[in-house]
């Protein structure tokens, strides 16, 4: 998909976590762009799950209850104990995007490799999605999302 789109990357921005790093490296290798400038920043890291960290969904449900875990996972502004809500993630990801990506977007193609909630936060910003809609949005793992920037707005390709 990316190769066919001719979306060659001039800059590669990634989070600090290994899985997204490896995904980005695979993409660059497949596109014959392994020498692309790489910038790592924890602002793109996955949502922090606090006390849920290290638990799978079943373990979290057993400890905190199915309804509570569902609220934490699918609410926009309710965070698990010691963790971040999707709003918190949005409030971390979007300023990074505005400061470090938007200034380059009109002259460069930028690859961003990150986890689902960081990407959902970014999609909310790019597509101006409501809080109610964004909590329903699923980001498929390993499936590229391509946006074209033109005339001050982003269009999903």
Predicted regions located by residue number:
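Single conserved hydrophobic/aromatic residue that forms the stacking wall/gate
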Residues: 1-8, 12
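Short glycine-rich phosphate-binding loop at a beta-alpha junction
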Residues: 10-16, 109-113
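Catalytic metal-binding/acid-base residues of hydrolase active sites
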Residues: 18, 44, 117
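Phosphate-handling substructures
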Residues: 27-94, 138, 148
């Amino acid at each position: 998909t990316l190769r066919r789109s001719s979306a060659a990357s001039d800059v590669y921005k990634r989070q600090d976590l290994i899985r997204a790093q490896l995904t980005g490296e695979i993409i660059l290798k497949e596109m014959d762009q392994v020498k692309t400038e790489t910038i790592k920043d924890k602002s793109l890291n996955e949502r922090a799950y606090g006390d849920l960290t290290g638990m799978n969904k079943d373990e979290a449900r057993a400890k905190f209850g199915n309804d509570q875990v569902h609220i934490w996972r699918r609410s926009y502004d309710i965070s698990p104990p010691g963790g971040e809500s999707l709003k918190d993630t949005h409030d971390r990801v979007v300023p990074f995007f505005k400061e470090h990506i938007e200034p380059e977007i009109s002259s460069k193609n930028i690859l961003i490799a990150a986890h689902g909630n960081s990407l959902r936060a970014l999609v909310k910003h790019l597509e101006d999605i409501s809080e109610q809609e964004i909590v329903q949005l699923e980001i498929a793992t390993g499936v590229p999302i391509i946006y074209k920037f033109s005339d001050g707005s982003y269009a999903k390709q």
